[in-house]
């Protein structure tokens, strides 16, 4: 399945679609929680007019993200995370984060 995130207001540009991305993030998290694979795909914006024509979008409706969602082919288990102290710093670069 594809979800096409669109706006109907304003002149189309990548900045004006910024309000869509928090909703897209929530959809990605929800898909993951349901065991589905999903990703944000904005590459169609390089061919905006052709993409909108192929999707059959009416005039004034502009797509900003396509989210393909489906069942993964391989193993889709829990995410493994490393320690934060190697990637999160406190106050300045290289100073390990001291969690409370």
Q: Where are the predicted features?
A:
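Acidic, surface-exposed loops and disordered segments
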Residues: 1-100
């Amino acid at each position: 399945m594809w979800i096409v995130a669109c706006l109907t207001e304003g002149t189309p540009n990548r900045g004006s679609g910024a309000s869509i991305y928090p909703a897209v993030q929530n959809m990605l998290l929800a898909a993951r929680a349901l065991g589905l694979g999903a990703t944000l795909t904005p590459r169609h914006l390089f061919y905006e007019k052709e993409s909108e024509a192929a999707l059959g979008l009416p005039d004034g409706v502009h797509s900003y993200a396509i989210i393909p969602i489906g069942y993964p082919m391989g193993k889709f288990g829990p995410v493994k995370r490393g320690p934060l102290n190697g990637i999160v710093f406190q106050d300045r670069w290289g100073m390990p984060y001291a969690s409370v």
